Every structure is written in structure tokens, then in C-alpha cells.
Amino acid sequence: MPPKGHKKTADGDFRPVNSAGNTIQAKQKYSIDDLLYPKSTIKNLAKETLPDDAIISKDALTAIQRAATLFVSYMASHGNASAEAGGRKKITPQDVFVALKDVDLAQFVPSVTQSVNEFEQEVAQRKKDKVVRAQDDQDHISSSESETEATEEEGNKRIRTDE
């Protein structure tokens, strides 16, 4: 029995169908347009590196967007090859450094290493701040509870008057 949402075609294969009952053709290849990074992100990154009075044309932004997507995919491919050579499935910063050296971009390794170290320090600081906030919240909650208990005890006391 075919899976739900599939329809038998004339050649005997089962293919998924859309809500209208038409078979959905599987996409064989992806183009770069399917993988592009958001233009807003690319534009913000480009503006950070350019002078304040610089203007980026629409065509230039598209070229930067496509180049960034291709470069990251290329580096990820080389990093993945390095990880697989090391018997791992996950790409580490060291794999990226090896990939940079493999594609003759070794001059960028020191600056990328510095950026990775800064990022790791930021992450560690955020974790510390989160722990401190959680402890402060816990202290605040426990002090609020003790104040509430004290108020309730005072409210339960009855004043005795000798008449």
C-alpha cells in the first residue's frame, strides 16, 4: 500500500501529490538562488566594512550576496572534507583553518582565529551572566517569599486586650 498522499502514476510508480491531486515533481537540482543568504544580512555586513558615506547599488549587493553564498559553501565543503578525514561528522573551527590553508587563504587564519576566540569569550560571558541572573532571580524570589511569610504571620497575630 502506498504512503498517504501518494498517487500511482501510469508507469506504476508512487509519487507524492499536492492538494489538487496532481503529482509533485521532485526537484533534481538546486540553484544558487535557492541557497542565497538574506539581502538584509549581507547589506548590514557590507555596510559595517565600508565607509559611512558609501552607497551599495542593487547589482553590487546581489553580486556580494552570491559571492558570499558560494564562498561559504566552498569553505564548508573543504571543512567537511577535513572533518571526514579526521573521522568526524561535525565541522570544527580547526577544520575551517585547515580549509583556509587548503584553498591558499592561509593569511586569513590569524584574523579568523582571533574572531573565533572573541566569539567564544562572548558566549562564555553570556553563560556567566545567565547564571548570575538566575541566581539573582532565585534570591529575589526567596526573599519575597520570606517577606510574604513575615507579613502573613503579622496579619495572623491578634492583639489581646484585657477588658
Swiss-Prot record:
It comes from the Eukaryota. GO terms for molecular function: chromatin DNA binding; protein heterodimerization activity. The keyword Chaperone does not apply. Residues 1-22, 126-163 are annotated as: Disordered. The keyword Nucleus applies. GO terms for cellular component: CHRAC; epsilon DNA polymerase complex. Keywords: DNA replication, Nucleus. InterPro entries: CBFA_NFYB_domain, DNA_Pol-Epsilon_Subunit, Histone-fold. GO terms for biological process: DNA damage response; heterochromatin formation; leading strand elongation. Gene3D superfamilies: Histone, subunit A. It is found in: Nucleus. Residues 126-142, 154-163 have a biased composition (Basic and acidic residues). As accessory component of the DNA polymerase epsilon (DNA polymerase II) participates in chromosomal DNA replication. In eukaryotes there are five DNA polymerases: alpha, beta, gamma, delta, and epsilon which are responsible for different reactions of DNA synthesis. Heterotetramer. Consists of four subunits: POL2, DPB2, DPB3 and DPB4. This is DNA polymerase epsilon subunit D. It comes from Yarrowia lipolytica (strain CLIB 122 / E 150).
